[in-house]
Amino acid sequence: MTMDQDELLKVRDRYDAEMRRDAQPDGAHARVERTGRVVRQTVPGLGWNGVLWSDLDEDTADAEIAAQVAHFGARGEEDGGPEFEWKLYSHDRPADLGDRLRAAGFVPEAPETLVVARTADLAALPVEPPEGITLRVVTDEAGVDLMMEVHHRAFGTERPRIREQMLTLLRDEPDTIEAVLAMAGDVPVSAARMEMRPGSAFAGLWGGGTAPQWRGRGIYRLLVAHRARVAAARNIPYLQVDASADSRPILERLGFGVLGVTTPYIWRGTRP
C-alpha cells in the first residue's frame, strides 16, 4: 500500500536527516564531513565524490558553491581528479540553487524521482521467477563482471566507477551490499544491487537494467522483491530508489511513493 502524503513528508524528513545531513560514508575509504553549510563525501580513486546536503539561502549559496569547487578542484588525478556531483533535491533551498549551480559551471544530468516504500509491503509480494530464469547472488569479481556485462547490454555504457565500488564493498564490507543476477541458463540477462549502512532505516536499490529481449517479463519486479526480502530480514523499514523515467511507473505500481525529484549537477573541472 502506498503511503499517504502526511506519511511521505515524515519519511522525507527522516531521509533528509539520516541519508543526507547525517550521512554515513558509502565505503570504507570514503570520508563524509560537514563543512560550512554543506555535507560532502570525498573518496580517492573511482568512488563517488559530491555534496549530499546543504543548508543555504540567497545570501550564502554562491560562496558555498565556490568553496566546494575549490575543495574538489584542488584534487589531483591520483586522488580521483576534480570531478564531483552536487546532488540537488527539488525541496532544497534557495529555490534557484539549480540556476546558481549552472552559472558556476555545473552541468545538469537527467533528473530522477526519489521514491520510497515500506520494506514489509514489498517483501510480501507474491513473485515467481519467469520461466527459464534463476537468481544468482554475487559474491566475487566474476559475478561483478557479469553484472557489468548486463549493464553494457542494457544501456550501452561502461561503469568502471560502479564496478570498483562493488568490488570494494564485497571485499571490505560484504554485509552492506546485496548484489544479484537474473540468469537465463549461463547467460546474465538482468542485474541489480542493494546498498545498506549499519543502523540506517533506508536501503537503496540500484541497477535493474535488463537485456532488451528479456524486458516486460517481470524480471525487474522479481529483483525488487528479492532485495526487499533481504532488507526485511535485516529489519530495515524502507526501500529507496532514485528512479529513472522508465522505472518510476513500475515502482509506483509496486507501491512506491514519491518524495521528490533529484538532479545530479556535475562539475568536471572547467566551465563548459
Q: What spans do the regions from the language model cover?
A:
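Conserved active-site tyrosine of GNAT-family acetyltransferases
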Residues: 101, 251, 256
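Short amphipathic alpha-helix that is part of the acyltransferase structural core
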Residues: 1-21, 52-56, 112-114, 121-169, ...
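A conserved beta-strand-loop-helix scaffold within acyl/acetyltransferase catalytic domains
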Residues: 158-213
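Conserved beta-hairpin
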Residues: 31-35, 93-107, 177-192
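A conserved beta-turn-beta hairpin within the catalytic core of GNAT-like acetyltransferases
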Residues: 42-52, 109, 196-205, 215
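Conserved acetyl-CoA-binding loop-helix of GNAT-fold acetyltransferases
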Residues: 61-69, 207-212, 216-229, 233, ...
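N-terminal charged segments
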Residues: 1-79, 93-94
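Acyl-donor-binding surface of acyltransferase catalytic domains
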Residues: 59-142, 241, 263-267
